[in-house]
């Protein structure tokens, strides 16, 4: 069990590092969140493009 715990800790640390880097770019994160809200209105125009992009990244994240 000790080995497993060590592995999980290293994994969580790498995740936190990625999140911290994104937070430092705070502006980008906010724009992404806003675009998701307005994506419903623009879905009619860019159906294939927005769906492919957000379905792959958005679903895995959230």
Curated annotation (Swiss-Prot):
What Gene Ontology cellular-component terms does the record carry? nucleosome; nucleus
Localization terms from the record: Nucleus; Chromosome
Disulfide cysteine pairs (residue numbers): none
Principal localization reads nucleus
InterPro entries to which the protein is assigned, alphabetical? Protamine_P1
Tissue specificity is:
Testis.
Top-rank taxon, per record: Eukaryota
Question: Which GO molecular-function terms appear in the entry?
Answer: DNA binding
* Alphabetical keyword list: Chromosome, Developmental protein, Differentiation, DNA condensation, DNA-binding, Nucleosome core, Nucleus, Spermatogenesis
Asked whether the UniProt record includes Translocase among its keywords, one would answer: no
List the residue ranges of the region (Disordered): 1-62
Annotated GO biological processes are: chromosome condensation; sperm DNA condensation
Establish whether keyword Nucleus is in the entry: yes
Q: What does this protein do?
A: Protamines substitute for histones in the chromatin of sperm during the haploid phase of spermatogenesis. They compact sperm DNA into a highly condensed, stable and inactive complex.
Name the family. Answer: Belongs to the protamine P1 family.
Q: What name appears for this protein in its UniProt entry?
A: Sperm protamine P1
What is the organism lineage in this UniProt record?
A: Eukaryota, Metazoa, Chordata, Craniata, Vertebrata
Which gene does this sequence derive from?
PRM1
């Amino acid at each position: 069990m000790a080995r497993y715990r060590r592995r999980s800790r290293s994994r969580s640390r790498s995740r936190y590092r990625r999140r911290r880097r994104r937070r430092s770019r705070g502006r980008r994160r906010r724009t992404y969140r806003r675009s998701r809200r307005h994506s419903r209105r623009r879905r009619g125009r860019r159906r294939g493009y927005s769906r492919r992009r957000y379905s792959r990244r958005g679903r895995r994240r959230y």
